């Protein structure tokens, strides 16, 4: 379908043209490149709504597959779609289609890819050899099972006599002490293979790459890639020489150097020409590299600084060539080929072990009825695909069913998709991109999950292939407008990324389409310029060792951040509040501190707390180190095996038993031999020693408890044991009274929850649980302390950049920008890559030599490029979290050296910094500082001037504060801190402290403070209409409360109640069930109602007993009444209409004393609503006993009943009017007892 047939954007619409295009475009595969803050979720929701309400071709919501990255995102998507549908329903209250969509929403396929896979597997489990009752494996349980399977396989391999290849593998890849490296290789290959649609095929390809028989080095993919890298390095060297020549030609430059530099340039051009031909050509050319010696010059004749720069640039060029010579061309091509020949059979054995491991691991999971997340993807793929003759995957009959079912497949965060997930998506969508039904949204600049095997190349490939028009394939749409941030944040981010992100280094071209464009409007603000603060760490401040240096850097940055936050809060810094559309004073919750990883978080937290700043960080370690958890773990170790001195002594010394050092010594002195446990038993058998009665009592109490716990542990569940220990020791309550008690109790609850999760696995018992925990600790998988903080707490948050993705904060600090990138993965003994497979050193155990191989060199360089690109994207995510103020902080050790490096590109005349500068960066500052040092706002340029920096860069419309901060000034103690220390010392010595203080009034106010919302804490935030009615009228026994939000089918009564008659409530519920389900299209007679009731019994809407209790005559009498006839003749009838609405708390609670603006959530069910020509009538059915209960008959009953139900019907009417946007003309109560009608008047 052509573009012009799409719906036009409505006049006055707030959607941008690109957003509207993303909402309505269809008829082909569509890729939406949505920049940070561009409203992609809103676009996605609007697209779904437009498809659902399309007048010509409406689509049911369960015919859409919406794939999100997280469960939280899926739930938010459902909520947003639900809210949007409810708004449509208000405008079109009679729309059955919209009501149907709301009912279908909960079962719609809006989920993560894993949830969709699970849904497919649950539906078609019989196509797989798995138990339909399978469960998802716990991650730690999964890892432990892997270790068990691997141990078994290796034990068998070691036991085989004729197993030469295995022992050669062991000799090459294990140390003298253990075979941990071999185990890591097998597990890593298993994981890497799992990220491919056909793991075995990928493993086979990996081995085949080492089969070089009949090949030359030119045939190897590794050599082809490395040649491209050789060209890159030679271009870098050439750039250095050209720059040196420019400097040499300056008036004060060393012109005599020109002759040598020109010779150097010819040499580099010769090498570059060889690199364009073949590996062998470069190898031969490298053997003849010879650099001329520089001619001596009289340095006093020339500018000394320029001479140094020229010589430095030449040395850099020589170093580039030298690195190539040493790493790649010090060995003959044939030597590299021999490596592959020798390693080929060994690698074949390694892959055989990986396959064996995968098969056995799969078998043990099948036996235990468990699957992991990788299984979910592969099992789903297995169900949806068949293998064609060419080995390619083709859609199975099941996949074709899904293709027919789904009108469109929408994928959020597409940049984080992996190869297996892409295959699954392809199988359930149309084959042709030009006529496809796949809608993908994402931002490849925010693809930061390569460590989870996400493949940004999938997004990039389509982005390059698709066009804006989508005429010959898929269509791409750029959403570049950012509705989150101020101009200063966006311009600052653009200024940096226009200089550092390119296709060669960074994988993405940061062009005009990729640039962030302003979409949000903010009032004028003060001090909104972005900032770069570089802390200079002087030599005398640096602690010994690399670790000490890191601690010092963390402390310096923490101090600076704390000072800035404190200053901003104290000075009344303002931020914009979108809820009130006004500027307001900044609060602690408006600040976030972003880190690449969390090692610095504890130091930053400590510093902020010292400054009185509330702070929270979700740490990934420290749980098992927490005192309360440690003590409890020792209790359980003693329960499992009391003959363990250290755990038992720890428990005896803990608050649980409460022995002091003297008592422990007295106990040990009782018997010098034997375990503590044996000594304790011996001590208790004897009479209490003189002065040891209290000790005897304490031990007796504990020993009695311990025996009970040991017996309980043998018979009952672990989680019950834990709670029993908490209860009987009172320890849970005890820690609640300590400082940080809320957090400590949360930690103990997590231990209990962890035990329950453990019991849901294939492991059982206290001993195995303790071993389970030990294995977690051995593998370094400690957990963070339990979360004891609400989302809206007024605290500064510290989090990783990864955790911050998708979030936004008014003020963002990005710290640790001077920390080196983590290149540990590149230093491993073996490397794995999706395209290049396996690479490791060549190890000859007989000659005891090892050296790098061509595959290792290629993979290492490729991974370094990918790491650089990923780190750029991580930085982009960090900078785009800020709404109003962005503050970048980094620490450097040698200011002069770093400045020289950063200013090296100051004269560069193009926007994009040289490739070698960007590729050689070792930290974020190596990108940020060279970029900002080309802008007029950098203080350094005030001294140096613009030079040759182009105006469009130098004068770029962005505001920055760039400055160095002296680390010494940060570490100097503050006067206020010294004053606090004096007060603390006085308090410790129990001395009186002066009351005269500027905080005296504040202390008094806090001590006498009364919570202004106290009334709200005494009432429920959610009420049913019936409960509100009871608040107004006391119950007199004749009323039956049976209204619920949704009435469930009536179940069989418990046996002990079967012989008794129905209660008033049960009888009322049965009557309402009949009134809800009776067919109004049939003629209403006693016979027809009896027949319908019988059908309700068959459908299990009613039980036989309940059907017998219903008065059919009363049902018929209603329909013969004037009101009943109106129901039968009405234009439309709705029965059992559930509703939820917000109500003023004053209306809900008669004696409400709280704030007038407080609201509560009210829910209820309206029995019947009829629409007639002149409006809507609301009917509420009542089964109250009236006849014979009121001496004055109905005349006496009427005002009482009217008053009793007036509030209830008023709330029903209010809910209807709010929902339908039409007034309710009449409110009627119908009483089956006596066939009475009461019309409620206001």
UniProtKB/Swiss-Prot annotation:
One of its GO terms (molecular function) is ATP hydrolysis activity. GO terms for cellular component: cytosol; DNA helicase complex. PANTHER family: ATP-DEPENDENT HELICASE_NUCLEASE SUBUNIT A, UVRD / RECB / PCRA DNA HELICASE FAMILY MEMBER. GO terms for biological process: double-strand break repair via homologous recombination. Keywords: ATP-binding, DNA damage, DNA repair, DNA-binding, Exonuclease, Helicase, Hydrolase, Isomerase, Nuclease, Nucleotide-binding. The keyword Nuclease applies. The gene is addA. Its EC number is 3.1.-.-, 5.6.2.4. Belongs to the helicase family. AddA subfamily. Residues 13-486 form the UvrD-like helicase ATP-binding domain. The heterodimer acts as both an ATP-dependent DNA helicase and an ATP-dependent, dual-direction single-stranded exonuclease. Recognizes the chi site generating a DNA molecule suitable for the initiation of homologous recombination. The AddA nuclease domain is required for chi fragment generation; this subunit has the helicase and 3' -> 5' nuclease activities. It catalyses: Couples ATP hydrolysis with the unwinding of duplex DNA by translocating in the 3'-5' direction; ATP + H2O = ADP + phosphate + H(+). It comes from Bacillus cytotoxicus (strain DSM 22905 / CIP 110041 / 391-98 / NVH 391-98). Its cofactor is Mg(2+). NCBIfam families: addA_Gpos. Heterodimer of AddA and AddB/RexB. InterPro entries: AddA, DNA_helicase_UvrD-like_C, DNA_helicase_UvrD/REP, P-loop_NTPase, PDDEXK-like_dom_sf, PDDEXK_AddAB-type, Restrct_endonuc-II-like, UvrD-like_ATP-bd. ATP binds at residues 34-41. Residues 506-806 form the UvrD-like helicase C-terminal domain. This is ATP-dependent helicase/nuclease subunit A. It comes from the Bacteria.
